[in-house]
From Swiss-Prot:
It comes from the Eukaryota. Residues 18-72 form the MADS-box domain. Interacts with AGL15 and AGL16. This is Agamous-like MADS-box protein AGL1. Pfam families: K-box, SRF-TF. GO terms for cellular component: nucleus. Probable transcription factor. Interacts genetically with TT16/AGL32 in a partially antagonistic manner during flower development. Is essential for the coordination of cell divisions in ovule, seed coat development and endosperm formation. PROSITE patterns: K_BOX (PS51297), MADS_BOX_1 (PS00350), MADS_BOX_2 (PS50066). It comes from Arabidopsis thaliana.
Amino acid sequence: MEEGGSSHDAESSKKLGRGKIEIKRIENTTNRQVTFCKRRNGLLKKAYELSVLCDAEVALVIFSTRGRLYEYANNSVRGTIERYKKACSDAVNPPSVTEANTQYYQQEASKLRRQIRDIQNSNRHIVGESLGSLNFKELKNLEGRLEKGISRVRSKKNELLVAEIEYMQKREMELQHNNMYLRAKIAEGARLNPDQQESSVIQGTTVYESGVSSHDQSQHYNRNYIPVNLLEPNQQFSGQDQPPLQLV
């Protein structure tokens, strides 16, 4: 009998395979509670992954043997249950096209509102608000995101600052080059202008001297030479005798 029992246990273990256990109620209370906690957490994680990866509306409701409630819903448990009831009633009485479109757009609107709410919560978390609902792991992830964001902002700021400095240095070199060019032009003009001014002064002086000398010569001639008509006798008194000179 013992050999037969041992062979039966071996056959049953072979049927279950490696790493598998027989699915039946766990009699030990402590083991049952530990298994419940592990399986519950795994089920909640799978429900979350399904809702995120497949964009599915998921609602999960769990009651423990003690009557404690555990739930998860990416939208809301009540809303998902109402949708379930409506889907069951629609299976009996199919809705019209208008009702189907209305239901579709309501679902899309609800999804958009949920996304907006998530974005608003994320924005509040970034500025340090509404942090009471976050656990340690979520706070750690938020801290890492903020540090990465600050690092990117600083890197971009430094990049713009370096570009601005390079532009100003280039502009300074251009202005210095233009300044040197203008100084060279001014120096060249200063070298050429004295020759031109000297030649113009010489020409003006020559013209002035020539004009003055001709005028002075004419005045000199007028002063040194008596006009001929003054030496000629007056034709009015030419026929009369001139009175003798009388000494008084």
